Amino acid sequence: MLRYTLRQLEYFVAVGQTGSIARAADKVNVSSPSISAAITQLEQEFGLPLFVRQHAQGLSLTLAGRQMMEQARVVLREADALTDLAGNISGTVRGPLAIGCLLSFAQLVLPALRRGFVTAYPDVRVRQIELNQAEIFSTLRRAEVDVALTYDLDLPRDLRFVPITELPPYVIVAETHPLAHLPSVTVEALAGHPMVLLDLPFSSEYFLSFFDRIGVRPHIAERTRDMAVMRSLVANGFGYSIANVQPLIAQSPDGKPLKFIPITGEVRPMRMGLLMSSDADRANVVRAFVEYCHGLKADGELPGQEAGE
């Protein structure tokens, strides 16, 4: 008779992945004592030390712990598959759904999207994680997320992309910027002005490709990996930036006004969509999420869609 639960295995895997009880507690949204108790109970049940406790460095998996964690992940995947099978047979949508989202637009798109989905499907337990493009690829391959909301940037062949909407690029400037009065702007017009580059894997290459096409190097004055920091730098006069998803409110996080100007000329729009493994939508919950996103696009209610209209 089993004396441990799937929940305890989930906590064990979370600690193994993060190397910290506190970070694992944040990841699975429970208290640290609950995580500690689960690990202690599993070690007692298995008769094995799963972790080496190092006060300065957190927890490290023992050799036995690494082997047990790999098997625990298999058990959890099989349990999810059993839930999916039950849903497919009954036609219900329920169970866990791990959603990855690209860092550059997660704050603008994911919370409202998630709220609407869990309202429509209250029996689904959603977990979200914000990632850069390279991390999205790796977490999908490791089955740490079921589906990821991202752009069609350098997509690998072993993952399947379902496009949802197309978002042309636009320039972000402060109201006092010399280009702020223009109804549209060309890449050539940007070349002589300082740029605040959103410096994320694959995203930065996309933005810089606009200048490669015309044989010009942009004047990169600032680099940041954070969308909110980028908007604040722009609003405070450090330069212009480029993005594809537009916030509803035309101001920076520190309250200063911004202008959003479409870019004209030969610039490739970005396609936002859902990236997943080739067979991911065999699960009812993933298929329901894909259909839900398509429905929002059709109704003109997809967050961030305003920039592409």
Question: Where are the predicted features?
Answer:
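Interdomain hinge and pocket-entrance segments immediately C-terminal to HTH DNA-binding domains
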Residues: 57, 63, 87-106, 120-124, ...
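A short LG(V/I)-centered, amphipathic sequence patch enriched
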Residues: 43-61
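Alpha-helical linker/hinge and terminal dimerization helices associated
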Residues: 45-46, 68-90
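Central regulatory/effector-binding core of bacterial HTH transcription factors
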Residues: 94-157, 224
